[in-house]
Amino acid sequence: MCRDKTYTIQSPDCSLTVTIGCGDRIVYSIRSDTSQILKPSPLAVRLVSGECWGRRSRVAGVRRYRIDEVHDAPVYKKRKVEDRCNGIVIDFREGFSLEFRAYDDAVAYRFVARQPGEVLVAGEEARFRFAPGAVAFVPYVRDTPCRHDGLAFGEQFMQSFENTYT
């Protein structure tokens, strides 16, 4: 089992620290250089087959990497976009990986299927246990048509930066 294994990565400027814990569940937390942002929060993916990635999963290996690239962006508001982060990929014996990236101003994660063939996902558990006093900006999708745009629920799915934040 991956009981009590803990992995940590920091953003390139060391202002954010992500801690990933493996035990009976996979949990992660985020800390800035001044305060706790996210308390340990569980992550899991349930497959149609009944398997659950993130529950009693066994670590097979860990790889760390660094990205420091600049990309041309001819149709964006900036000419060049920096891509700087530190990353970790945790491989699990159950045929999946969990990848985290820590940027100077953000954290991202994803589950990656390593097994051949099709993988059907039944659901995902992504909890966000914010520490007291933490501030978050959340884009909401309305479940009824909006007066000003008239979009139905299914037509509202888009990039999060295109939606209303509250």
Please state what every model-predicted region is.
Residues 4-166:
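N-terminal accessory beta-strand-rich subdomains and adjacent acidic, glycine-rich linkers
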